[in-house]
């Protein structure tokens, strides 16, 4: 009962006590009964099949009749076994997970421990952006600690910096850590809303227009999954009217769609990314040893209105990646390639200097996305050609580098 009250207050804020706690107990009890009934039927079926098979093989028809009687007695005892089951905290967590989409295990996990370890977990997957990760995790931790304004989203963040430095990757990792799955990330490309008439698609087309029954791309996605991370990519390319919609979300935590339904953003993390300030560079795209955060912030203040910036919980500047960061990212991509090859029943051995060479080339040509393309051109394409020329599927694949040329054998 205590767990039902705690979880209902935490994850079902739009409903009221005691109804929402009672509903969770009812759904948990139904879940227990369904699982128990299924397990008992499976046990009875396995028992009867084995016993009857043995009796028929040995022509023991009297024993077969006894098994039939035993079956009836066991079936009569099943209701008593179901009544003896109790609803546990894990059953209540399962009921909440069905409504919110958050895995049941995370509902029962210690929230305090998870938030304290958030920076360490995210930093291990987002390379070279420790300061940005710390700022984002601090804002999210404050929003989930219970002291935030309940009428606002968990956090409203603006991530700025050049392309290919990890802004989108950070959002993907954060969504998985907070809500258990990467599909908790609702991503909208703001290049689709550059025209004034396209802004209405966020909340739904007006009555009489095409697409009115479909709902808004933003409001409908959040209405179906209120516990999510909303990512608005490349915000500076959107029409200025989009800012008016975001002001209401960041201040009130709700938005009314074209059908008159109030969509709740109070349990969502709202993240906007921008490449404003990305032109402040003297080297290749995405890399610069100097810290230009002050100049980036000045560009942000010139691009966005003060009332918009004033409603943000944090403006996070992503730094340009250096050679060591690129080498670590190359190692990460190569490990992913090894995993894909291993999934096909083969083992791929790569030299250590390959990551160093790819990282140096990626630094000269662009950010992490360019590095991914370099790996595809220099490693994946030759590897695919090598596999096609093999008459038999190899168990081990080795790689060598001579004069920056990669060969497989």
Regions found by a protein language model. Name each.
Residues 1-409:
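AAA+ P-loop NTPase nucleotide-binding core of proteostasis motors
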């Amino acid at each position: 009962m205590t767990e039902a009250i705690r979880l209902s207050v935490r994850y079902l804020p739009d409903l009221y006590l005691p109804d929402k706690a009672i509903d969770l107990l009812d759904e948990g009890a139904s879940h227990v009964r369904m699982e128990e009934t299924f397990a008992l039927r499976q046990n009875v079926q396995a028992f009867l099949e084995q016993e009857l098979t043995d009796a028929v093989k040995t022509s023991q028809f009297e024993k077969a009749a006894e098994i039939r009687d035993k079956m009836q007695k066991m079936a009569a005892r099943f209701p008593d076994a179901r009544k003896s089951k109790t609803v546990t905290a894990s059953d209540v967590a399962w009921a909440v997970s069905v409504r919110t989409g958050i895995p049941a295990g995370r509902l029962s996990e210690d929230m305090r421990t998870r938030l304290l370890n958030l920076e360490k977990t995210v930093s291990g997957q987002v390379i070279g952006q420790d300061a940005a990760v710390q700022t984002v995790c601090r804002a999210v931790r404050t929003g989930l600690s219970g002291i935030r304004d309940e009428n606002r989203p968990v956090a409203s963040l603006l991530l700025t910096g050049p392309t290919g430095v990890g802004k989108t990757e950070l959002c993907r990792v954060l969504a998985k850590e907070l809500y258990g799955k990467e599909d908790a990330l609702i991503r909208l490309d703001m290049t689709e809303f550059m025209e004034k008439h396209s802004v209405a698609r966020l909340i739904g087309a007006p009555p009489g227009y095409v697409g009115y029954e479909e709902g808004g791309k933003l409001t409908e996605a959040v209405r179906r999954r209120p516990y999510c991370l909303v990512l608005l990519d490349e915000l500076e390319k959107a029409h200025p009217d989009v800012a008016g919609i975001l002001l209401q979300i960041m201040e009130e935590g709700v938005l009314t769609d074209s059908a008159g339904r109030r969509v709740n953003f109070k349990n969502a993390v709202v993240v906007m990314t921008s490449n404003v300030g990305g032109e402040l560079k003297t080297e290749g795209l995405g890399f610069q040893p100097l810290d230009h955060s002050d100049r980036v912030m000045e560009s942000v203040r010139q691009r966005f209105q003060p009332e918009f910036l004033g409603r943000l919980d944090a403006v996070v500047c992503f730094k340009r990646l250096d050679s060591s960061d690129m080498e670590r990212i190359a190692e990460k991509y190569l490990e992913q390639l090894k995993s894909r090859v291993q999934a096909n029943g083969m083992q791929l051995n790569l030299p250590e200097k390959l990551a160093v060479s790819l990282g140096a080339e990626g630094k000269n040509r662009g950010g992490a996305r360019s590095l991914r393309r370099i790996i595809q051109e220099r490693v994946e394409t030759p590897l695919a050609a090598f596999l096609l020329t093999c008459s038999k599927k190899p168990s081990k694949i080795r790689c060598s580098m001579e004069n920056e040329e990669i060969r497989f054998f």
